[in-house]
Amino acid sequence: GKQLLPGGLILQWLKIPSSAAVKAVTLDNGNYQLSGYKWPQSFGVLFAVFATKVSGATNEAYAISVNHNSTDVTVTWNARKADDVHILGIGKL
């Protein structure tokens, strides 16, 4: 989803379901990577982005790759997980 905020800020989020883990590509270093996910709208300026799973009382951050002027989102992690991944980004249009 997305939410426009005062001052031209935009907050966007998406959830990659746990069922998507089976589509992850194994990298040479043994990590797993999922791509093919997209923001609702591209950021003109990207201030911060964060990806995490929330499972009980445990939060775990993941490496994430996004660029301004693109809607593409790629997430990398070090073990095949069966948890939903939540991604949040903030920036300007």
Where are these regions (language model features)?
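Short acidic-hydrophobic surface loop/beta-edge motif
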Residues: 1-6
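Extracellular attachment/recognition segments
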Residues: 7-93
